Amino acid sequence: MEFWFSEFHTPDVKHSIRVNKQLYSKQSDYQRIDIFETPEFGRVLTLDGNVMLTERDEFIYDEMIVHVPMAVHREAKDILVIGAGDGGVVRELTRYDRVAVSYTHLTLPT
């Protein structure tokens, strides 16, 4: 039997991804957290049924959210990242020697 994750955008549109295995599933105090292993996108993180990131394309989001502002604000030194997620934004910020990075995020339940 095939296993698919579907994200519903409108009543007439959904995006589906074939899943090899569900790696994690938990309802936290804040949201439903699921992690899937997929053949096309690698690991996929969903929150409340919405895709947040995939291994295959996370760099696109992280690079754009970091390097565009850093190019505009060349004197940035102290940076606070709220909602650090997978750590990709923090990873990209560490490419800049001049910055000190602090971050915070919700802790996943154990």
Describe the residue ranges of each PLM region.
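Conserved class I S-adenosyl-L-methionine
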Residues: A76-G83
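Conserved alpha-helix/loop element of class I SAM-dependent methyltransferases that forms part
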Residues: I60-E75
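Short beta-strand element of Class I
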Residues: A100-S102
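Class I SAM-dependent methyltransferase Rossmann-like catalytic core
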Residues: D48-E58
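N-terminal auxiliary segments of SAM/dcSAM-dependent transferases
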Residues: M1-P39
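Conserved small/polar residues in nucleotide/adenosyl-binding loops
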Residues: T104-T110
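Conserved SAM-binding loop of SAM-dependent methyltransferases across substrates and taxa
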Residues: G88-Y96
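Short, aliphatic-rich beta-strand segments
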Residues: G42-D48
